[in-house]
Amino acid sequence: MSPSLMVYVPAIVCLFLLIHQVRRKRTSNLSLPPGPKGLPVLGNLLDLDGRQPWITFTQWASTHGNIIYCRLLGLPVVVLQSQEVAKALLENRSSIYSDRPPISTRKAIGSEFNTAQLRYSDEWRLHRRIFHQSFRPEAADAYLPTQLHKAHQLLQGIIETPERYQRHIELFASSVIMSAVYDYDAKPKDDPLLLAADKAIKVFVEVASTRTAIILETFPFLLKLPAWFPGASLKRLAIQSQKNSAAMVDIPFRYARERVMTATSNRCMISESYERIDVQNNADEFELALKSSSATAFIDQTASTLIIFVLGMMLSPNAQKRAQAEIDAVIGTERLPTFEDRSSLPYVEAVLRETLRWHPVFPLGLPHYTSDSDMYNEHYIPKGVMVVANIWAMSRDEAKYPNPNDFNPDRFFMPDGQLNDDTVDFSFGFGRRICTGKHFANASLWIAIVSLLATFRFMKPLDDDGKEVDPIFEWTTGIVSHPVSLPCRVLSRHPGTTTEKLSDIIELSV
């Protein structure tokens, strides 16, 4: 090294250290979003309601505002409590907020297939493009006849066994997905593929809950314990989730692929996607992405939302009567509603919106993850933190939704009697991670709701003295929230309606 260069080396080193110190000081002086104080190591984990963490987050908003910072077992989390903040960050700055947290346990719990959990990458873009091509609004309309047919099957199932209405709703939601994605016509009763898919999803949403996911991510050794080891319940749950998910991904895909290859498949996501496949360019990669993205469709909110709709109708009989009166006035009783009637039934539309708002089935959605640091309203949001959109808090915004715990479809009407422009899209997520199948899901929800309202009354259960009582039930835990075993008296609106008579009405409606 020359003497002249040796003179500059210390100066360069000092300059580097000075710049580093200035940057470090500048970062340390930046203010993180406000939030509750936590304990060492545990952070705020013990403060959370383990079954309904969104309730705790919403309570924190009243003290700390619409953007808060907390730590859960050492993991930094930013919670967005209002639509305004969520849109400002997750949509307007989507280049920073479109990633997902790095989940090292994805393989262990069998969620590698899940497009929604993929990191923001070329792999995710391929998955999303495949799904979007089949379920974008103009493409999803091709499935309307299938959704109508499945809604009619739902009615027939409930007429036969009204006490199993919740199971019929679950079968409706799954069978619509199976038909649209795999061209699989599910059996009305106890279809093996539907049962396998339902079992897989129920275990997955439990193991993927916020609290469980954080525990597994912080203490991954829990998944390395022998399944027989005392206290290894999470390990056993992960094994069950992995096994169930593998069956849910592989079996229906093999069925659909075989039908495509033998030219016996009707239009569905799989057949459409194979028509677009470029055999000269990563065909294997495309097929793997197709198999995974198609299975992601099972993580659907339709069944959960419809069960919440039933609860809303029981607890708000006036809303139920008004919706049914509108249907009778527009359509009559000689046929069932179709999609062509949708624009003529604004109150039914308001019932759907209120169902989505009243109890969001994904109260926290899925967490985002910052790919870079950011500043918002003088608050510093570091790179590499989990960002959660608290959908529940947004649904409880009293400035926008007065008396938010009431089921009140009237809140979606303007003074002139027209529907307002609030379609409750926040329930489907934000930014580039918004649910790509929301148009398809919305259509399934509407045709099911309007068909159920046209055909049945949803009444509170009776006590031993024959008096109506409020239903007693529990809510699911995990990333999806809906009533479990919701007691309800489902009665035909037209006494004497049999399966045969309903079939005749259905024939007049198609």
Residue spans of the language-model regions?
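Classical protein tyrosine phosphatase
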Residues: 79-89, 98, 183-194, 300-325, ...
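Conserved cytochrome P450 K-helix/beta-meander segment immediately N-terminal to the heme-binding cysteine loop
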Residues: 375, 389-417, 505-506
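Cytochrome P450 heme-binding "Cys pocket" and the immediately downstream C-terminal segment
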Residues: 317-319, 439-483, 491-497
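Cytochrome P450 heme-thiolate "Cys pocket" and heme-binding signature region
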Residues: 414-447, 472-477
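Cytochrome P450 catalytic-domain helical core, especially the substrate-recognition surface
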Residues: 37-55, 76, 103-182, 195-258, ...
